[in-house]
């Protein structure tokens, strides 16, 4: 591996931060630079320009080495998430340049312009880390794993602040559940934490261990007046010293009286009055008109049915009358013809 790769690494370190370049601590960045030197440069930059390019790289390295550092702006450490974010951004832009197949002086210009922009981008990542993620605990002792950019080593850093994280006043009604929460927002991100221990503190400066374990809350069901008083929560660490201490002052309030709601089937006087008043309200004109139309429709239907029934009944009576009249005349004539015959028969016999 020639001196070109070493100078590229130095240029990258200088361009990305005004100190030792943290992104060079990422193995994927080192592999990408090796590929750039061995695979891309030979076919995209004439040999006669290699020397001039490397002189510019060397000058860039010197310029960044001479920058004065502001300790408040950059502390030379980052966490794993910040390093990964900066490395991914750099590799993405480097791949964009190599995929474009740019050559010659244009390649050199784009490479150094990309390094300049990546320096600004990574600086914003570092500033955000130092403001939001570096030692975020406002109290207690947090153990945070950091990466030292000077030697790319990971070490556990102790963010030491006051052990005392204050006192909390808790009010709970009698016969309700008491819940004491000892967890702080940075506990999950800290390393080297052990168990939560809850103590009952008595007036004679003595205390009794109530519970110990991984649970960050202490729950006591159906508290009584005897549960009022002082409690203390202590979170342990691997350093044999507490990470946080929180004090609780518990006040047990009188038992809450719950109002009994009446059954839905029982009508109270107020409800009866309301219902009666609602029933006595006059109907709206639209409802009155609809009810009248419905009544007229029903009456008309009944009258029509009655008329049809009566007409059918009358028709049947007329038909029966006609039939009876016709049959009645025929039987009378037959009787008249039969009488003379009988008389004739009698006269013959005589």
From Swiss-Prot:
Glycosylation is annotated at 204
The record's gene field reads: IZUMO1
Q: Which residues lie on this side of the membrane: Cytoplasmic?
A: 314-350
Q: Show the InterPro entries listed in the entry.
A: Ig-like_dom_sf (IPR036179), Ig-like_fold (IPR013783), IZUMO (IPR029389), Izumo-Ig (IPR032699), IZUMO1 (IPR032700)
| Tissue expression as described in the entry | Sperm-specific (at protein level). Detectable on sperm surface only after the acrosome reaction.
Q: How is the protein modified post-translationally, according to the record?
A: N-glycosylated. Glycosylation is not essential for fusion and for proper protein trafficking in sperm. Phosphorylated. The cytoplasmic C-terminus is phosphorylated and undergoes phosphorylation changes during epididymal transit.
Give the domain of life. Eukaryota
Cysteine pairs bridged by disulfides in the record: 22-149, 25-152, 135-159, 139-165, 182-233
The signal peptide stretch is: 1-21
Any one of the GO CC terms: plasma membrane
* Stretches of the chain found on the membrane's Extracellular side: 22-292
- Protein name per the record: Izumo sperm-egg fusion protein 1
* Family, similarity comment: Belongs to the Izumo family.
Transmembrane residue ranges: 293-313
Q: Where in the cell is it found?
A: Cell membrane; Cytoplasmic vesicle, Secretory vesicle, Acrosome membrane
Which example biological process does GO assign this protein? binding of sperm to zona pellucida
Phosphoserine occurs at 325
Annotated domain remarks: The extracellular domain assumes a distinct boomerang shape when not bound to IZUMO1R/JUNO. Interaction with IZUMO1R/JUNO triggers a conformation change, so that the IZUMO1 extracellular domain assumes an upright conformation. The cytoplasmic C-terminus region is not essential for fertilization. It is however required for protein stability.
Q: Name one Pfam family in it.
A: Izumo-Ig
Q: Which UniProt keywords apply?
A: Cell membrane, Cytoplasmic vesicle, Disulfide bond, Fertilization, Glycoprotein, Immunoglobulin domain, Membrane, Phosphoprotein, Signal, Transmembrane, Transmembrane helix
* Matching Gene3D superfamilies: Immunoglobulins (2.60.40.10)
**Further remarks about this protein from its record:** Izumo is the name of a Japanese shrine to marriage.
- Its job: Essential sperm cell-surface protein required for fertilization by acting as a ligand for IZUMO1R/JUNO receptor on egg. The IZUMO1:IZUMO1R/JUNO interaction is a necessary adhesion event between sperm and egg that is required for fertilization but is not sufficient for cell fusion. The ligand-receptor interaction probably does not act as a membrane 'fusogen'. Acts a ligand for the human-specific oolemma epitope FCRL3/MAIA during fertilization. FCRL3/MAIA replaces IZUMO1R/JUNO as IZUMO1 receptor after sperm-egg adhesion, which permits species-specific gamete fusion.
Q: Region entry Important for interaction with IZUMO1R: which residue ranges? A: 148-160
Q: What is the lineage of its organism?
A: Eukaryota, Metazoa, Chordata, Craniata, Vertebrata
User: Where is it predominantly found?
Assistant: membrane
